[in-house]
Curated annotation (Swiss-Prot):
Note: A Mutator-like-element (MULE) is present in the promoter of japonica type cultivars but not in indica type cultivars; this leads to an accumulation in response to high light.
Organism, scientific name: Oryza sativa subsp. japonica (Rice)
UniProt keywords, alphabetically: Chloroplast, Membrane, Photosynthesis, Photosystem II, Plastid, Repeat, Thylakoid, Transit peptide, Transmembrane, Transmembrane helix
Membrane topology: Multi-pass membrane protein
Role summary: Involved in high light-mediated energy-dependent nonphotochemical quenching (NPQ, qE) and thermal dissipation (TD) thus regulating energy conversion in photosystem II and protecting from photoinhibition. Also seems to regulate quantum yield of electron transport in fluctuating light conditions.
Protein name, per record: Photosystem II 22 kDa protein 1, chloroplastic
Localization per Swiss-Prot or TrEMBL: Plastid, Chloroplast thylakoid membrane
SUPFAM superfamilies: Chlorophyll a-b binding protein
Induction description: By high light.
Length: 268
């Protein structure tokens, strides 16, 4: 009896093991395959989208760049550092230069006609040592020399106008005149003389007046006589070079010039 029970138990164990081995070999039903794949792929897609959404939210915006400040015009302090003290700007120096050009042209023309230098025309004593000259005259010479070399300080700057180039300058537009055909500006000055050029010519005139006065104080001769140019003649017999200088300085003084003055305060 006991042997039969052991044999039946062993047979049951063997049968259970064989059934467990056969189950994995069985094919999976088609319905289970069809229904299980979309759910897994859908879950993966949803999980990927969720990660993508959370990933976008974590991105940081790039910091905005600050606008770079515009470069300021350099302030010229001069020899004595008086740029911020007396407020001598390039615009003031341009005015002084225009006055110097008019004065220099008038003194040359007057000496060519009368034969007298600029000091002799004003009935001032000449032909004396420089230290015996009038104090006001010496101050004028010193001020003119310092202004001519820019020692008083010249704040600000002259900015030239943008030149017109291309077809707008090469072709005569309808309604324009003869100046456009020659390449000249229609509404501006004729010679295109800028304020920066006029400032340079004004400094030359200041130097010319200062040295001609110094020479006349010491020698008693005017600017033309110091250069051995004939003076005291009618205007139609004056040297052509002298007349050219007179006309040049006169036109340069009254010419408005192109460009504009920009100060340090405007730039700030």
């Amino acid at each position: 009896m006991a042997q039969s029970m052991l044999v039946s138990g062993a047979n049951g164990t063997v049968a259970a093991a064989s059934t467990s081995r056969l189950q994995p070999v069985r094919p999976t039903p088609f319905s289970r395959l069809v229904l299980s794949q979309p759910s897994s792929s859908l879950g993966r897609a949803v999980s990927v989208k969720t990660v993508a959404l959370f990933g976008r939210s974590k991105t940081k915006a790039a910091p905005a760049r600050k606008a770079e400040p515009k470069p300021k015009f350099k302030t010229e302090d001069g020899i004595f550092g008086t740029s911020g003290g007396i407020g001598f700007t390039k615009e003031n120096e341009l005015f002084v230069g225009r006055v110097a050009m008019l004065g220099f042209a008038a003194s040359i023309l007057g000496e060519a006609i009368t034969g007298k230098g600029i000091l002799a025309q004003l009935n001032l004593e000449t032909g004396i040592p420089i230290y015996e000259a009038e104090p006001l005259l010496l101050f004028f010479i010193l001020f003119t020399l310092l202004g001519a070399i820019g020692a008083l300080g010249d704040r600000g700057s002259f900015v030239d106008d943008q030149p017109v180039t291309g077809l707008d300058k090469a072709v005569i537009a309808p309604g324009k005149g003869f100046r456009s055909a020659l390449g000249l500006s229609e509404g501006g000055p004729l010679f295109g003389f800028t304020k920066a050029n006029e400032l340079f010519v004004g400094r030359l005139a200041q130097l010319g007046i200062a040295f001609s006065i110094i020479g006349e104080i010491i020698t008693g001769k005017g600017a033309l006589a110091q250069l051995n140019i004939e003076t005291g003649v009618p205007i139609n017999e004056i040297e052509p070079l002298v007349l050219f200088n007179v006309v040049f300085f006169f036109i340069a003084a009254i010419n408005p010039g192109t460009g504009k003055f920009v100060s340090d305060d405007d730039e700030e």
